[in-house]
Amino acid sequence: MQSMHDRRHPTARASRIRRFRVVAAATVAAGGLLISAAMVAGSAMAVGYPAPGGIYAPFTDCPLHDPEMRLAEPGFAMGCIKSVTASGSFSVNGIPVPITQPVTVQFGTYSDTDSNGNQVFHVVPTQDHKVLLTEPEVIPGGFFLLVCLSGDPSVARLCDTAMTNGQTDLEVQVELAGEITNFGPLNLTPFTLPVKVKLTNPMLGGKCYIGSDDDPILLNPMFNPVGTLNFQTDPDPVRFPNVAVLSITGSTLTDDTFSVPAATGCGPGEVANAPINAFLGLPSPSGNNHLVLMNNDALFADDFANGDQARDLLDAFQASR
């Protein structure tokens, strides 16, 4: 419901809505950068609560029940982000790995101010803390290319077994390798998404990775170019005047800044580390690697109320069912 101040001063509410649009647009733009994740299995909202509907239907995993979401300062952005990328590629030293599976990220966010009065955004993971989960990309003959073409005698037995058993394909899967950092509302400023890449083949064992939690690949993707902006207010503007969903669709994101560490844990006694690193040229410095993410759609459900924003947004979700 409008405040007495808004009724007496209609320009105040108009100004507040304009601020909502500007900051929300910047925030969802930043959220759109978080694209190296896949659809999270399981729903935080679904644990004891029906899924939201209408314009809020995409946000079933938003952790609105997490107490941390109530730490937002009054009048500052608080809400839910979901970002989906349809396709792309990840190249190391000119060797590309296609991204053919849709990738999704979704999390909660709130903002407050630091000791210098600057607005700071915080990331709140879903209830199951699976902020990043990707579908594996299958590379036919990938194990043979990475490991066996080297002719390294130390992997000859592995290669013979793989060829005999028809196990020469390779699965490549991106996993989260730490906390998202430097997240903020500036759509031209990338934030940092730490990842590691798991290489899976029966000959490699279950711990073959490029990058690790201690030495991750630090992705800093940026819009290039930004897609189409759309703004949807809540269907009940009297009850929820500060709640809306902003979307940016059809964006492309790129990053050429990240370095790629060497492979570790590959094969018995890690004998496959050396041929994998030699084939890919690992470790690979910044400037030699390239990430392209295409057809990215980012959504941001946000609340700028001056009270309990998380409660207000949750009420809007529940009213949409």
Task: Describe the residue ranges of each PLM region.
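Secretory targeting and sorting signals
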Residues: 1-46
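Extracytosolic secretory-pathway proteins
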Residues: 47-321
